[in-house]
């Protein structure tokens, strides 16, 4: 990660304190919007890949990052976030799969030190989303904590046919 002190993605300016992430109804397509509704970043899953891959572009269609699965058909595994402009791995996203709770650990790609953790809130909601027909329509709620376990943000799902999250 050269001499960078942060885990920023070159070409992406995140200046608001909240964003909305919305998934397309049909495919694994996502867009993140700022408070004014402007698209900051968007991406879609590449089809027919053995390893899941999500390239992301900014509002001007410039490539900014890629998220790629570490393994084939990775239900509980890791994903690498790579800066498209520098080619550097930025962070590793570890998914600890459980029917009771969704947990993502975010680690520095170089040192492997834990940077943050994202945990779903409410085991019953997580079970319903995974088991009940149409359970995917139930909104998720997540808590984001830093490496010391302090709350630094939240992700609140909104009831919708497609996943829609407010990140604060």
Where do the model's predicted regions map?
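Intrinsically disordered, low-complexity proline/glycine-rich segments
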Residues: 1-168
């Amino acid at each position: 990660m050269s001499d960078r002190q942060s885990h920023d993605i070159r070409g992406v300016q995140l200046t608001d304190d909240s964003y909305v992430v919305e998934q397309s109804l049909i495919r694994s397509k996502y867009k993140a919007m700022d408070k004014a509704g402007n698209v900051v970043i968007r991406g879609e899953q590449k089809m027919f890949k053995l390893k899941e891959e999500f390239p992301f572009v900014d509002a001007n269609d410039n490539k900014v990052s890629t998220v790629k699965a570490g393994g084939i058909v990775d239900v509980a595994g890791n994903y690498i976030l790579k800066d498209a402009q520098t080619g550097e791995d930025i962070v590793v996203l570890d998914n600890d799969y459980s029917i009771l709770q969704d947990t993502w650990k975010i680690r520095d790609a170089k040192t492997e030190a834990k940077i943050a953790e994202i945990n779903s809130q409410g085991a019953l909601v997580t079970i319903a989303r995974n088991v009940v027909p149409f359970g995917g329509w139930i909104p998720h709620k997540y808590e984001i904590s830093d490496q010391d376990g302090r709350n630094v943000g939240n992700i609140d799902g909104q009831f919708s046919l497609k996943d829609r999250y407010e990140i604060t």
